[in-house]
């Protein structure tokens, strides 16, 4: 449908002061589109990419564009040319989320209460355990790109600096931070990472590519940042590689629903849906774009629970 005149005016005002995107020469790529001709833009290579810069210079805005680049866009303001690996997942902390039978031992081990982290369960996850679960669940669904913003991450999941490692020894800390696994995730599992960071320089060491957003313009500062990082100690890495996470979760989820006299799926806006009395909170699933997606997810989950989760198929087989 054609936007109203008022909406169109607001849209034009928003674009009036926009800064035209300019790609650094080192990341410039060109390709020809059918009926469109040649276009040129920034291509971020596979590997570990760090996006840095001062506050309000466009770091998170660039990441948000990449998050939604998994979708096709209506032609208009240029977002239709933002293309991201379709398996890309936005990873963040989700305090309070539930976790069921998930192997987070790649990041969380030796909890003081003795709780099993190979098959971890909780109704109220912390920031670090929730982000660990989000990473492992993305691996389980064969994601090949993680998108992470420092602002929405659990600090203790992302990094432990050298001083903290000296004071709190490795065998006293149950969390293996993401920085110690990021290189392994790429080299062993083929999973790239794009991370927005504004305050922690430790990721300069493992990064393959470092882009600085300067007044909304991306600049390649990889060489400069790598040279500067030589004067600072690297984070120590675990001595042993961790076994592959276990992805054999099987659920028989339909029995209790089949006993219900009436089954109702209700969409509660873009951020939640309910099946009978159970509510699924999607506030922190940032790649959901509209309410219709949430409705589709609700019906897909209902069908899956009634017809596919038979206790024999693992979640990957169910999803396929």
Report each predicted region and the residues it spans.
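Single conserved hydrophobic/aromatic residue that forms the stacking wall/gate
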Residues: 1-7, 11
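N-terminal pre-Walker A segment at the start of P-loop NTPase domains
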Residues: 12-38, 113
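Glycine-rich phosphate-binding P-loop
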Residues: 40-67
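AAA+/P-loop NTPase substrate/partner-engagement loops
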Residues: 69-108
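Flexible beta-alpha connector loops of hexameric P-loop NTPases
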Residues: 111-128, 160-175
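Conserved alpha-helical scaffold flanking the Walker A/P-loop in AAA+ ATPase domains
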Residues: 131-138
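Conserved P-loop NTPase nucleotide-binding/switch module
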Residues: 138-182, 186, 196-226
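Conserved NTP phosphate-binding and transfer environment spanning the P-loop NTPase/kinase superfamily
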Residues: 187-190, 196-320
